[in-house]
């Protein structure tokens, strides 16, 4: 797999048949396949997944649901979903005409290394811009919205004056290299719930899909605010 | 209570039973529980209550309705509402699985000190940014939109060339300290219908929910405009 | 009348009875009372009529329909509309609990001096900001969108390289003085279909409600673009 | 034809009768006439086709569907559509009261020179602004979103570190001259799927309507990002 966009040369793995519709068709609006479609529309309207960019995955027990590559996010339907068994990494369902998301190994990293319940990847312009201004990490402190972000290494959320630190990894031509550096960042920053990718975007995960969504929203708010602070020459880490 | 976000360690006070559904379930779209849900969606779409931030409360006679902590604002339903008796400060209704908003003592200040009918709290980025540029108060004059803001100490609204002054209080780690300084600001600025909180957001109240909404909207417009004026080096208080 | 916002001291003129409902209640979505409500929602979502600011009026033959003062634009209903006879300036319909828009004499100027079919007034932030950067007139040339603006003094629209000139009048505490200067601007600039009001907003009119809407939209686009050009030091009137 | 806006002096060519309704009336939401209306609403909400500006056309086999001139994009209905035979350039359907889009010869260029399936023209402010900052071409490299853009001259999309180059042509008073320079740009830049028009906007095409939409979205994202990078003094082509 070579990118989060549709890779033309990529062979669709056909371990699961497209007839496994019961895995994704449900009247329950909280079914992962339905939630992915709903959230993709929200993210599209925020400008985070423009032009088929970005991705989202939800885990339910040992099954992970993944939005496909190359489909317009605001037009996603449950029938488009890939379903994978987390342990074996075999596809339980593969839509015949679609290609799996190149984000899949990155989502798997969050599931396996952090026991995440969902993982969101956006091409948010605020995320891209912040990676052009910061070097190894993005840092911000003493903004109330920081309280929405979890400490991860212990229970509870960051305090108002705590410093939020999000590592920035370098983008790569080849997806495999991005997986390696994402895993390294997750190890080096045990307290982070997100990783920025330079000139690319951001990965955010959480214990549940709703927590992942809230973390992503709060982080994007902080990235936007940081850019406005930078424009006025105000440091994002408050000096005392 | 430690923040407007969900405080994990906080004990939910169970003075009222969740069976008191008749307090919040109504076909009337103007019922406070319905209005709170409707307005939360509007505020979410404005980017004012991102990531479960912010809050809103409406008073109807001696009953106050308060949106809970930690619930995504755009997904709020009437069943999520807390109801409190204003005088005794006892909860008349407490949703079992939710925590009361940490904004509650701040909302109570507006109700008790100003006889407000509703109080809105947002994490508007314009509000946060303005508190990074102004010291003790935000001031603006000679903008038509100022006419939407009430004089408070006497009948009627501000005139075009009047100076709108909104006090800025310092944010605190602990909610109790914020309540004290909010009350002090309300006393020191008898003509204000809003208080800015540094690096946090804004509290706005009004005689009715619609007035509070209009004041909040008009103030946010003025805060945004002030930031644009600042960028161009134009003072927000017109010099004659 | 003292402002486009609700003037508390102002006596509602009760020349028409509120029972004249047939003037505003219609199943036809193109009825002026319905169109005003629909367009107010559009303008609200554009941030042009925040906090009850701004106004709109449509003329049908000798009857003019006017949105009331002090009502939230996105919650307007046909029953809120005032109806006036253009020639006598008598109200044909006066909603009992509402106050007529203070914009009324300004709308009348566009109807009487220019035979307009509709007049739109917004508090667009782009309009306000432009009046802080330009002196007597706003000018822009050589932008394709200019072709959406009419020549007024002759048939057809401006050409690409034509110069769009919109006069700027000073805002006033008292509405009457604004009416005078608006009329003067209309006389001095026979080719204009809009007048900017310093630190206040803009008035735009057209032969029909749709033309007024398109002109207002195109002008606001040009005002926004002019602000971006200013930020980059690019003159809005192209130098050859 | 003199502009993308309604040209008053232009004779409507009545080669086809308006009774040819079967060409545009369909229950199928993917019918070109329905898709044009749907996408015009999306583009309007993005601010790309404000004030009747811009245009869109879809080809189905030898028939091309074209949105008319002078109609508000968000209020377009299938009955407004022109239908033309690509080879003969004869109109198969001409709505009686409407004028054909002045973009028609430009759309035809994309169909004939590139075998496009759809062509989108917007007055995006990001497009206009970029043409004020760049000379002969707009260039950007090493941004992940570039991967959404096709190579055109060979299969597949651009790589992350590839340089996206979009030619900029000069705007003209007369439409004919724009057609000539657009065709010249298409010839000179065989790898481009878009052409910017100075002080005017952008033309984007693709093999299908969905590809054209995705390309246009991804390019606009890159144009916006380029403007933000310029503001911070960061070159859009990454230097190694
Ligand atoms: Zn990506
Ligand atoms: Zn708060
Ligand atoms: Zn006004
Ligand atoms: Zn055009």
From Swiss-Prot, chains A, B, C, D:
Zn(2+) binds at residues 121, 123, 200. Belongs to the aldolase class II family. MtnB subfamily. SMART domains: Aldolase_II (SM01007). Its cofactor is Zn(2+). GO terms for molecular function: methylthioribulose 1-phosphate dehydratase activity; zinc ion binding. Substrate binds at residue 103. InterPro entries: Aldolase_II/adducin_N, Aldolase_II/adducin_N_sf, MethylthioRu-1-P_deHdtase_MtnB, Salvage_MtnB_euk. Keywords: Amino-acid biosynthesis, Cytoplasm, Lyase, Metal-binding, Methionine biosynthesis, Zinc. Pathway: Amino-acid biosynthesis; L-methionine biosynthesis via salvage pathway; L-methionine from S-methyl-5-thio-alpha-D-ribose 1-phosphate: step 2/6. Its EC number is 4.2.1.109. Catalyzes the dehydration of methylthioribulose-1-phosphate (MTRu-1-P) into 2,3-diketo-5-methylthiopentyl-1-phosphate (DK-MTP-1-P). This is Methylthioribulose-1-phosphate dehydratase. Binds 1 zinc ion per subunit. It is found in: Cytoplasm. It is an enzyme of class 4 (lyase). GO terms for cellular component: cytoplasm.
């Amino acid at each position: 797999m070579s990118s989060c966009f549709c890779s033309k040369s990529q062979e669709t793995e056909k371990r699961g048949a497209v007839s496994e519709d019961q895995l994704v068709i449900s009247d329950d609006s909280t079914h992962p396949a339905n939630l992915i479609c709903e959230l993709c529309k929200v993210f599209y309207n925020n400008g985070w997944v423009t032009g088929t960019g970005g991705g989202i995955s939800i885990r339910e027990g040992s099954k992970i649901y993944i939005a496909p590559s190359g489909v317009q996010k605001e037009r996603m339907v449950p029938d488009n979903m890939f379903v994978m068994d987390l342990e074996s990494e075999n596809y339980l369902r593969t839509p015949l005409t679609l290609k799996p998301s190149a984000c899949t190994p990155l989502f798997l990293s969050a599931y396996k290394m952090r026991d995440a319940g969902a993982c969101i990847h956006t091409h948010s312009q605020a995320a891209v811009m912040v990676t052009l201004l910061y070097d190894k990490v993005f840092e911000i402190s003493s903004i109330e919205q920081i309280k929405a972000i979890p400490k991860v290494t212990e229970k509870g959320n960051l305090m108002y004056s705590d410093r939020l630190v999000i590592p920035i990894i370098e983008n790569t031509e080849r997806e495999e290299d991005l997986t390696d550096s994402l895993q390294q960042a997750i190890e080096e920053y045990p307290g982070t719930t997100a990783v920025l990718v330079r000139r690319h975007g951001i990965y955010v995960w959480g214990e549940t899909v709703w927590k992942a969504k809230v973390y992503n929203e709060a982080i994007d708010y902080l990235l936007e605010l940081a850019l406005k602070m930078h424009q006025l020459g105000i440091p994002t880490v408050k000096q005392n």
